Structure formats: C-alpha cells, structure tokens
Amino acid sequence: MDEKQLSIDIVGLLGACSDALDCIEAELVNISNKHGKRVAYMSVCMAKYWNVESDALQDLAICALLHDNALTQYIAEEVQKNHGIDVSDETLNEKTNLHCIYGENNIAKIPFKTNVSNVILYHHEHANGRGPFKKVWQETPLFARIIHLTDVVDAIASSWEFKQEKWDICCEFLVKQKGQLFDDECVEAFFKMISKETFHSFEDGTFESKLWAMVPRKKQMVDWNTCKNIADFFANIVDYKSPFTSKHSMGVAEKAAQYAKYIGYDVLDVEKMYLAGALHDIGKMAVGNEILEKPDKLTDEEFDKMKNHAGYTYLILSQVDDFEEIRDWAALHHEKLNGKGYPFGKTADELNEQERIMACVDIYQALTEERPYKKGMSHEKTCDILDDMAKKGFVDAEISHKIRTCFH
C-alpha cells in the first residue's frame, strides 16, 4: 500500500480505550469507571516531582491509561483453561505476571516518543522484591513504580464507601507500606504532589480536564503500519472480551478494508475503514458476558442491553477530537436503511456509503465466522441472506451484490 499518513488524536483515542477497559474491571473487581484516567492523572502529577519532560509525561500518561490493557486476554485464557475465573482465588496474585507480560507485548504496537520498556511489565512489582517478578525498586523503572502506587491507591479509594475518609485511609496505607509495596521516594512524591483536593476532583469529575491540560492531546501523523498496529491493539482487546466473538473485530476490519480497496477507495480511506472496523464493537466492553455468551435466545430486556453496545461505541469514540467520521462508520453498523436499526434508527438518506458497507461487512463476518455455538456459514449462503435483507430494505443492495464477488 502506498505510504500516506492519517492524522489521529492518539492520546484521546487511547484515553477512550481506557474507559472501555474500565468497564471490564468494573465487571470483574468492582473498580469504578474512569480508573485508568484517575491513575493517569495521579501518575502525571507525581511525575512533576522529578521534573519529567513533556514527551515522557505523555508516554507515562499513555502507560497509565493502558496499564491493564491485557485484562481481557488474561481472563479469556483463564476461562478457557479453568472453565471460569474466581477472583477470590489466592493464586491470582501469582498469575499477575501473565497479565503484565501480555500487556507489555501489546503496547509495543503503540507509537511512544520515549523508551517505556518494562513499564507495563513491572507495574505490579513491590519495592521489597516480593512482586510477580521479584524485582526490588532499584531494578524497576520509575514509571512502573509510579503506576503501581497510583493503581493501588485508586483501587483502595474506589472500594471505600465513605467519601470523607478515602484520603485518610489511603495515606495510612501508604505510610504502612513504605519500603514494602512502595519505595520511599514514590511515597514522598505522592504526599508532595497529591492532596485531598485531588480526591475531590475525582468525585466532581474535574480531574479529567486537568489531566488533558497537563498532557495536551495533539494530533499525530501516523503511517499505515502504525495505524494498523493501533487498530489491531483495539480489536484484540475487544475480541478477547468473549470467545463467542473471538476475532470478529479483526475480521470486520480486514474485510472492510478489502471491500474499500476493491471498489477503488484511496489509501487513506482504506486505512480509515480498517480502523473503523477494528473499533466498531468497542462498546461491547460495557456489555456483560452473561449476555454476550448466553447460548439461548435473549429476552427483550437482554436484547435491549445488547443493542446498547452500538451506542456505547458512539459515546466512547465521541471523546476523540476530530474523529466523527470514523466514529460514525464504526458505531452505525447496526443501522438499517428502512429506519429499523439501532442505536439511532437512521434511515437510508441519513446513512452514507461507508456506514452501509460496515453494516453489510459486520453481518457477513458474523455469519461466516465459527463460534463456540455454531459453525461458520458458507460464502454463498451468507450472500443469499444479505441479498434477501437488501430486498427487505435492511441493507444496501449494490454493496450486497459486490460482496459476493469481492469476498469470493
């Protein structure tokens, strides 16, 4: 593919991703939403203690936002091996190293400006060397030590019911764990740079704008390989959410780009279609697995919750600056030309070609892919179903017709 570059608000996009990841943590361990952004804000505040320069500060924020990026992958493997996961299992702490290894490998896809090697890998290490990899604080990168402290502090604060006591409880814990979980320097930095007012900003929501003021979100020009890496990063996180939809996002991304190239889109639009395909189901991170993995027909109430995922995708991607086009291509994949789709009930005159393509590609991928409860449907049978849907006014007939030859 010819080298052309796409302009993306990468920090904003990764911040939106952290909100989606937080939905998984909220479902699993009852940590409140915006966990990643709170960890990022405290981490950036603490880093000022060491006068960390702007590029490194941005990279720290990204690492903090994505510190639990491998959570869905880790859980998926545990579920597959053990037919479930018990969060009270005492051996989970010993298995934390897997989540760190996967996370370190995943963020290699992100275009950092500075060296962040081992930051995610060692973000659960203890100062006294009793963490997953037995590294003492002197062997652990500063950013990993900062994220470890802020991650634990936010988990404690999130679990404490009484707002007025959160600060005192966290401070007592840090003093007690000085030299054990956390090194003296990081504890000192916390008390110098974080205050009770910081916790108040978590309650009233003002911390998020303060975070972006400290870490400006500037659009970056990215080439195709970088764009694909970012897209694949998101798709893998979504697809690991449930084995019932494993590889679905990757499949939609690949086929959306394949179709766009087939009908003559230019390089940048092919890239954007790939990215939109990778992101189209990011809203499913906010839908419980009891619904995603239910083998029986969903009740009306359950189906309404399932349908919410498209709206969640729209809301998540709305956080990204100048991303409206890709947001719409991604989020409107369940809209129908006759106005009977969701989340907005848009009609034919409100749906552009890219949104219509994504709707058809999503259906094609869902029908042809193999899932735990069904075998994949043949190309011909799937195309027949799409043609029938076109006749009924659900999808675009021309796109359905071209898919028959494009994906053959």
Pin down the residues of each PLM region.
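Histidine- and acidic-residue-rich, metal-dependent catalytic cores
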Residues: 2-408
